């Protein structure tokens, strides 16, 4: 029995020794161990560091100053007195009078001084001091270096073409100039043949439509389909006349292009209106654009 009790005491002593060693190596355990002793160990006090965040407090001594704050970085307060930071001075627009030195005022720009060489431009410089009155310095004279080999190329005036004769087309007087009509005879002949072929083909198609559709006694002129065909024929005649004028007289090219665009837009609008009015009509009126095929055989 005594042997058992002695063995139990040895076990307890060993456990106490191991716990003490672990506690000595662990700083947290040492802090907890000395909590009851009111932290009498100076080394433990030096190890425990409490970081304080900056506290922004309203300054009491600068209560009447707007936008003033007191930045206190210590946990126990500022013992040396309040040192307020004026926000108004931190965010001031511009500079203070004692920070401005040798402010230069450039002269107004002038074309004569820019193009002419050896022109002296005056730059007035003023300095301000901390006193209430500022004394301006006399203007300094700066001489620009002479520019060598400076040439100014003049812009030639725009010359209007000389008009030889006036061409009256659709009650519009258009001047034909000799400088713009530079088409060779061979190209002009080819364009003339193209115009004649297009005219002849166009006339054949128009005659066929007039015979089969418009000249029919039983036709209803109030029918949207018939009205569309009549408008197409009228617009196509205008386009052929404009095309021939564009070939014969080159100054009419811009006018001809504008006229063709207007005519084509009229054709497309008429075709859309006809399709909207004839929903049950199976004929596709878009085939009538520039191709006068008879669809009412």
UniProtKB/Swiss-Prot annotation:
Bias kind Low complexity: ranges: 122-135, 268-287
Signal peptide: none
Residue ranges with Polar residues bias: 65-79, 140-151
Domain of life: Eukaryota
Region (Disordered): 12-43, 65-85, 122-151, 265-297
The name this protein goes by in its record: Putative uncharacterized protein DDB_G0291005
Species, as recorded: Dictyostelium discoideum
């Amino acid at each position: 029995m005594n042997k058992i009790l002695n063995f139990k005491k040895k076990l307890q002593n060993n456990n106490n020794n191991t716990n003490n060693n672990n506690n000595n190596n662990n700083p947290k355990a040492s802090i907890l161990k000395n909590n009851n002793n009111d932290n009498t160990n100076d080394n433990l006090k030096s190890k425990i560091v409490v970081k304080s965040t900056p506290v922004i407090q309203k300054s009491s001594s600068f209560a009447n100053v707007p936008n003033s704050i007191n930045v206190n970085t210590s946990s126990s307060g500022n013992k040396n007195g309040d040192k307020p930071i004026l926000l108004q001075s931190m965010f001031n627009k511009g500079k203070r009078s004692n920070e401005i030195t040798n402010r230069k005022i450039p002269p107004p720009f002038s074309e004569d001084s820019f193009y002419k060489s050896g022109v002296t431009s005056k730059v007035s410089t003023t300095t301000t001091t901390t006193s209430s009155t500022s004394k301006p310095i006399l203007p300094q004279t700066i001489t620009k270096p002479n520019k060598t080999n400076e040439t100014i190329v003049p812009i030639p005036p725009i010359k209007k073409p000389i008009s030889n004769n006036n061409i009256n087309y659709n009650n519009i007087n258009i001047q034909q100039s000799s400088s713009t009509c530079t088409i060779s005879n061979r190209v002009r002949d080819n364009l003339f043949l193209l115009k004649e072929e297009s005219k002849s083909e166009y006339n054949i198609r128009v005659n066929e439509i007039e015979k089969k559709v418009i000249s029919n006694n039983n036709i209803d002129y109030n029918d949207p389909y018939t009205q569309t065909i009549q408008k197409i024929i009228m617009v196509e005649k205008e386009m052929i006349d404009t095309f021939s004028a564009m070939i014969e007289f080159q100054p009419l090219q811009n006018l001809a292009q504008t006229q063709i665009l207007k005519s084509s837009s009229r054709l497309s609008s008429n075709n859309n209106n006809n399709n909207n009015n004839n929903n049950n009509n199976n004929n596709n009126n878009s085939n009538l654009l520039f191709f006068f095929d008879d669809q009412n055989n």
